[in-house]
């Protein structure tokens, strides 16, 4: 039996669709249920940001989560396979019609991802203050809270609708299959068998 943490929403749905292709069987959570046991797997629905925590502490054996979450949390996990689903970009954005003033002694950057943000600007030798927000990031530069934002975009439409533009792409992200280090050794055959099946299915696309 392999325990799997899935992030609620689109990535969970796309992941379950992958498992359906692999095993020729429906993988469907009952209404409002957070646990699904099927075909030798126990799936658990959790918040995206919590997937690495479940994996690191071996509450589950493996998880599926975006590379952006792994990088932000510097998660100590085994990265097994890029599943190519849940594709998005982490970008620097600012108000339309304005340029980011890099001459300022320190820029204020609003973000849900302070680690990725600090690392990116540090590598460019730009001094910043990362303002951690939990939602409505797009609002920050429009009301003078920040000079720019670092946020996740899929198409960029939401930014345009909020009078913002993409200035720079920090990284491209998609969902990865990750494993707990102990589980990887304790259940190596099972996990590697799943890895091979997933890889074969993805390669045949």
From Swiss-Prot:
<comment type="similarity">
    <text>Belongs to the ATP phosphoribosyltransferase family. Short subfamily.</text>
</comment>
<dbReference type="InterPro" id="IPR024893">
    <property type="entry name" value="ATP_PRibTrfase_HisG_short"/>
</dbReference>
<keyword id="KW-0547">Nucleotide-binding</keyword>
<dbReference type="InterPro" id="IPR001348">
    <property type="entry name" value="ATP_PRibTrfase_HisG"/>
</dbReference>
<comment type="function">
    <text>Catalyzes the condensation of ATP and 5-phosphoribose 1-diphosphate to form N'-(5'-phosphoribosyl)-ATP (PR-ATP). Has a crucial role in the pathway because the rate of histidine biosynthesis seems to be controlled primarily by regulation of HisG enzymatic activity.</text>
</comment>
<comment type="pathway">
    <text>Amino-acid biosynthesis; L-histidine biosynthesis; L-histidine from 5-phospho-alpha-D-ribose 1-diphosphate: step 1/9.</text>
</comment>
<keyword id="KW-0808">Transferase</keyword>
<protein>
    <recommendedName>
        <fullName>ATP phosphoribosyltransferase</fullName>
        <ecNumber>2.4.2.17</ecNumber>
    </recommendedName>
</protein>
<keyword id="KW-0368">Histidine biosynthesis</keyword>
<dbReference type="InterPro" id="IPR018198">
    <property type="entry name" value="ATP_PRibTrfase_CS"/>
</dbReference>
<dbReference type="GO" id="GO:0003879">
    <property type="term" value="F:ATP phosphoribosyltransferase activity"/>
</dbReference>
<keyword id="KW-0328">Glycosyltransferase</keyword>
<dbReference type="InterPro" id="IPR013820">
    <property type="entry name" value="ATP_PRibTrfase_cat"/>
</dbReference>
<comment type="subunit">
    <text>Heteromultimer composed of HisG and HisZ subunits.</text>
</comment>
<keyword id="KW-0067">ATP-binding</keyword>
<dbReference type="GO" id="GO:0000105">
    <property type="term" value="P:L-histidine biosynthetic process"/>
</dbReference>
<dbReference type="GO" id="GO:0005524">
    <property type="term" value="F:ATP binding"/>
</dbReference>
<keyword id="KW-0028">Amino-acid biosynthesis</keyword>
<dbReference type="Pfam" id="PF01634">
    <property type="entry name" value="HisG"/>
</dbReference>
<keyword id="KW-0963">Cytoplasm</keyword>
<dbReference type="GO" id="GO:0005737">
    <property type="term" value="C:cytoplasm"/>
</dbReference>
